Amino acid sequence: MPMETVRQTCRPKHQILVLKCYPQYQKGVQEVKPNSSELSYLLYYVSTRRSKLPKVSAFLEKRAARDVWRRKIGNVQVTLQILSALIEKVPRDLPIFARSVLTIIETVLRSRDISMVEDSIATFETFCRHQDMAALSAEQDFANQYRDVIQIYAGFAHEEQQHPSKISSLPQTIRWKNAGLRAIKGAVSSEAGLAADGGDLLRIILPVIMENLYNGEDSFIESLEHKLHEAERNVPDPASRRRYSAVTVQTVDTAEGDPALAAQNIADVDRKAELDMRLLALRCLDQVIVNGSSRGQIRLTTRLVLDFILRKGQSNNTYLSLDTDENNWATSLIEVVAKWCPVQARFIISSAAMEVLFEIPPKEDTLDEAFTVIYIIDYLLKSSVNMIGLSVIDVLLGLMRYMAMLVSPASAKGTDEQPDSSEKPGYDDGTNLSQKKKDLLVLLQKCIGDLTTHIYYGDQVVDMLRAILTRIKPPHGQDQVSAVIPEQLDGHLSEANPTSFFSTSAKVCALRAIKNILLVANSQRPMTSAGVESRNPVGIHVWEGTHWLLQDPQKEVRYAYVDALLYWLKLETNKNDLKLKDRSTTTALISARRDFSNTSERAAKRATGTHHREKALVVAQSNFLRLLHLTIYDVALQSSTQEKEIRILHLLLASLVENLGINAARFGLPMILKLQDDMTTLENSNTQAAKVNIGSLVHGYLWVLSETFGLDTHRAGQEIYTEIEKRKSRSIWLDSIGFSLESFESIIKDDRHALSHNTRETDKMTLFKDGVEEFVRRIEESYNRTVPAHDPPTSPGRNLGKPVIGGYLPPANQQLSDLLPPVVREQMLSPWSKQSALEAAEREKAEALSLNGSRTGTLPVRGHAHANGTGSSISTNSPSTAHVATAGLQTSRRMSMPDKTVTPNHNSSRDSPVRVNELRRVLSVQAPDRDRRLSPLRGRLDASNGSIISSSSESMVSGFSNSEFEGDGGSILLPTRDGQEPLDGDGMETPRPLSNGNNYGYLQTAFRASSSSIPPVPPIPHGISIPGGFPNDSQRSLPTPDRPSTASSRKQSLINGKFGIAAPADDKTLHRQKSRTGVGLVNGAEVPEVAINGKSTGTHSYGLQEVEETSQRRDVQKLLEGVLSSSEPASTLQPRVASNYSGRRSVTGGIGRPPY
């Protein structure tokens, strides 16, 4: 054949090398492989000559097209294997011949030959494993070609897209599906492949995967998942396989296979093949979720899954309903997706589901789809899948918004139509809602409640209830229900807020959702669904501003509100709620559990802010209870003839007392007594029946108080019980109000008519008036006796690693903070009126707003400190006097930046320890009028000998401030004298450590007593120049030559019932001229010339007499003289013997003289 020889001679070398790889035709061989040696040389050839790669791939492309046309399956197999070898040999050069690879694969796929299609899968998997995603994203034509190939493979796996002529039997169908799913698995196994095309690939393959997973059985997905995990566990380890000898011949017995399957019939084999095919589809879904773990891909995957579920439900007419089993096919599929999804991205599934929900209009013909989506969301929320990062409030508001849209009149007419302006949506009773809408509303309420299955942060339940309650609005045109309009009654804000609830149905649904939240949050759940952290209890402040719902025109709203409130009282209150929560006790309660350690400025500010927040919560609680009892008063008078309403009010009042104790009784008792007085002035057509109902409500409440506080054995309790029995015997008592409370459900379901009473006997009812004072006194005694049992006294809060002041509190002081304040007793005895209650509510509301809005609070600054909650009477001293009386414990809150309006700062002893933040403060403050005040605790309370040895050692009270006692954050700035610093020396020297923990109980009074013996500090000598100041350009007090500034003073002791300095053996007692610095101040020790007010005064005595006085200073001196003269006569005072500790302070601490 000379022409063939010439043709072979003229061929390029790369074609010759390719052709040599094809073996000779062998008849009967199922799998043809390329010649190994020729293939190896071809791979070496192209790897060393990159320019030959396009030529080799182009030649393979032509060769494959001819072989496919001629149905030469063996040559096609060799071509595909050559391509796989080329990709693995030069993976970096794949973009050079990637288009040819896809062209060859596409040519093979369009042949519709199952054998060639199956042979192409290995090459396609190799291509997907090594492809360059940058090229796939950059070249649009290449990306379209890649997508077309995957579309063809997906069509093989989709039964509807298979060619009719190729579908002959079930085994053949399963074979085509397996081929398509294997190719899909290869495509999704590459993480970059899913992220390259913006989600187009997911839109192609996910519906095919889910189509092969669906068979209509509810538990099918769960069983598939179990088999998948079992198969993964049983996969043998290739490294541990036995190595066979070269001469060993495998027999039929050693071949792999399933003997049990071999013994079955053809139908069982087909079922096994179909199950394997569905397992392959589940593995594809696993790869999609694991590799497509970006947030955008998870969002798209969720939407595609939900769209498939909705489409299947529409085609099969099998939507989910309230009667559907929770473990159905749709919920199992979405749970598998959520479990396989990365933990940090699971919350996106719920967000995507909410987006799908809002794309479904709330119309009658689309309610089934909305129900399915909400059902799946609810299943996810209550499942064991923990979605960390879920925005609970966003999901809650979304569900509430859809609920509001569902009950609005526009939803019944369509979204494009506008509701009639003449309609009053606030007064619908829900009877016009279809059954589908009612079922959907029930599901929405259940879904909102299931949001609390997992607790993701402490205040989650509190925030959820607050978000719902603040969006419940009164209907348009409704008159205000009380003189106090809550903040949420703003009509313009309500119209702009789509989640506002105006209609009756919306309010009822929201209140029932609150009930579900409380039930789920308090239910006992298994550990698998437990939250990541414990939650905080829901306080009564959450209900502030909702009292008007008790007066709503629609009874459904009133009943739902009372039901939710009763569940809150039952589930969220404990014994601690029986203890009084009042502003007068807030300071003591906060101080009792605070550690007095050396805290930083940030910690002090945080403690102050927490104190203000707790005060605001207490104000909100009392405000709500006051207005709630006011509303109960109005409802009782308006519905005095309706027995059901009176029974509900009695149940509510009794539950408040039983669960809140004195906190509810302080507002309920005056209101009930006022209601008793108004009973005689009722002007109704059924006045006598109203008197019976009101009288039963009043004495029923009094009996509840009597039983709650254990007063049934006292005279007042016996009087109440006797009156109740007398009224029962005369038939002037409401029988439903008994000694045991009814359930709310029984009251609502009771449809019996009102019983007739002996109205002629109403004049013989005895009012409870004479025993009120004794009744209140017994309540006070019972509270004072029982509260310590609920709240046993504990030791002061300790923090390991930080010094603790004291370790003991006198029992008397501990009990004083637990006693019922006199203001509460007076409140229960004072006459009650609506106007006074409204004024008190407005006043407390304004105070709460000022506490929340002010940075430092608005409470007045007191001239005393509370030590661990022992408390003391409110000081009436002036700011300057109170400042002197606290002896270094300033009540100013330390600010992070200097104030422009403050006066020059206090001084600090030169030798006291200086901290880094004080040095930073010196460098940051330039102007003298912007100096930052030093910590009030740097001042010396009283020095000790131990502090002389090492002045840099910290005192145990060096972090101690009045801001931690009071928390009001006020700031007292001392007056200056012609630009000079104040001369009281407050906070100038190092405090001494506490000598004995037993004296800590007297800390507050001891501070005030010791402050009276501290003389003012004189100005520094004129000759000393301090550039820049130290710190803050402040003056320093110099130690006297006779006694160092850190020498110890006398211990404090109790003298004649008052605190003072312990007298020595020769009866030397405290005098106002005696100071901590020794006799030098008393005898007028001479000091160098100093300048006062810019004038040189020369050498003078260093004592009180030589200091220039002002009117304010004279007032302070008079106060001190009055305090000292009342404790000890001046004639007993003798000067202290001079000490020989001169100069020791100069070498024991500090950082030396400035400048630095």
UniProtKB/Swiss-Prot annotation:
Biased composition (Low complexity): 944-964, 1022-1031
GO annotation terms (biological process): protein localization to plasma membrane
Region feature (Disordered): 412-431, 786-805, 840-990, 1020-1057, 1125-1156
Compositionally biased tracts (Polar residues): 869-894, 1032-1055, 1125-1145
Feature: compositional bias, Basic and acidic residues: 908-921
UniProt xrefs under SUPFAM superfamilies: ARM repeat
GO cellular component: plasma membrane
Top-level lineage group: Eukaryota
Chain segments annotated as transmembrane: none
Family: Belongs to the EFR3 family.
Protein name: Protein efr3
Organism of this sequence: Emericella nidulans (strain FGSC A4 / ATCC 38163 / CBS 112.46 / NRRL 194 / M139) (Aspergillus nidulans)
Lineage of the organism: Eukaryota, Fungi, Dikarya, Ascomycota, Pezizomycotina
Gene name, Swiss-Prot/TrEMBL: efr3
